[in-house]
């Protein structure tokens, strides 16, 4: 390359890197730096969810645990380039008000406010993994420009402390967004696996597109979960799985096959499904699975809930 060509490339890089940084931080923002949520929730979410009172659902009364699974779509902060897609602080407080009523919470797309949201709900324990490698959001210069792009957006909160916590980035993802193959912009993907004293819990969020690249990526992601479960979790251990699987088995035969193979390979029973969101379990008694109709109220997804009975304590 000539000296003139090299100078042109250097000049372009001087403009391209700052421009890319501005676009990325403007599009997806950064983690919320405000330490606490101070707004008040005045949105009547409890009516949309089917609860007659704002303080519902009632706290758990016996040994059962009440579990909430929800893609909360908290992806950008107000003031970013795509702020029309951003939650207000009041909406996040409403999400926290609902989550605070549950013993165990599995959130997806908790990208920008995981820490203040976890503090707000008052759960004893919370975990929000961030990957340093893998998952799709770790390439340079993205990792330098966008701190939340290394996050899979998974937030788990519980009233009891776990005995072991693990997270693993996915090796497969659909890549750049197109009309049919979506990797949720630049964010990473992976799963969160937690061992509590009497049972295990897995939380995840899979690729979102409808195209073949996304279908293939989801297949490999589910296979990676299966490999992780067989490697890390005893086959007779009680296990709860809650996730935004981004499967639509009712309209896509390949998705149906992926789901069936995943359930069969891991000895799981599908407890509840609404759209792309699922609850599955093995060696656990579950009761009253339901959908909370919060899509269009506090998120672009409905929430799922279920009661699980505490298994006997291991000897």
Predicted regions: what they are:
Residues 1-8:
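N-terminal secretory signal peptides that target proteins for export/translocation
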Residues 66-72, 95-117, 157, 194, ...:
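Active-site beta-strand/loop signature of hydrolases that rely on acidic residues for catalysis
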Residues 90, 94-97, 152, 217-220, ...:
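Extracytoplasmic/secreted proteins, especially bacterial periplasmic and envelope-associated proteins
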Residues 29-55, 229-240, 246-315:
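Metal-dependent phosphoester-hydrolase catalytic domains
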Residues 25-26:
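C-terminal motif of bacterial Sec signal peptides marking the signal peptidase cleavage site
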Residues 35-59, 104-198, 288, 292-295:
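Structured beta-strand-rich core segments of catalytic domains in phosphoester-bond hydrolases
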Residues 69-90, 176-184, 207-217:
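Acidic/histidine-rich helix-loop elements
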